[in-house]
Amino acid sequence: MSVVVGYLPTPEGQAALSAGLRAARDLTTTLVVVNVESARGVREAAANPGYLQALTGLLQESGVPHELLHPVGDFDSAEEILKAAEGHAGRLIVLGLRHRTPVGKLLLGSTSQRVLLEAECPVLAVKAGQA
C-alpha cells in the first residue's frame, strides 16, 4: 500500500508533496513520488537544476519510507501516475492543481482530469497554500 504523488517543482507540486507526506505518515505507508518534470521539457528543468537534489533531501529528512520514480523519454504524465498507483498498490493519489480563471474552471488540466477519471483509488487535489 502506498500514497502516490504526481510531482512537479512548482508551488502546486510542493503542496501535493506536503499533503502526500502527511497522508503517508498518517496511514503509516510508503510515499511514491512520480517526478513528471521531464515531461515538461528540458528548458524548465534547466531553469532550476537543484530541484531534484532538494526533493531527494526533503524526502530523506522526512523519515517517511519513500520511492522516487523518474519516467524517461516521451511519456504521458497521467499514465505514469496511474501506473505507479497500480504498481505500488496506491491507497491515495495526491495532485497539485493550479489556480484557474472563471473560464478555466470549466476545464481541468488534462493530466489532472485523466487521473481523476481513471484512478482506481481516491484522489486528493490540493492547491498551493492550502496543503
Where do the model's predicted regions map?
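Structural beta-alpha unit
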Residues: 61-93, 131
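Conserved acidic residues
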Residues: 1, 91, 120
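Short secondary-structure boundary segments
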Residues: 35-36, 96-98, 127-128
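Charged helix-capping and loop-helix junction motifs
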Residues: 47-52, 83, 107-112
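Small/aliphatic-rich secondary-structure junction motif
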Residues: 1-51, 58-67
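Short, flexible loop segments at boundaries between secondary-structure elements
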Residues: 121-131
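Glycine-rich, Arg-bearing micro-motifs that act as flexible, cationic patches
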Residues: 95-114, 118
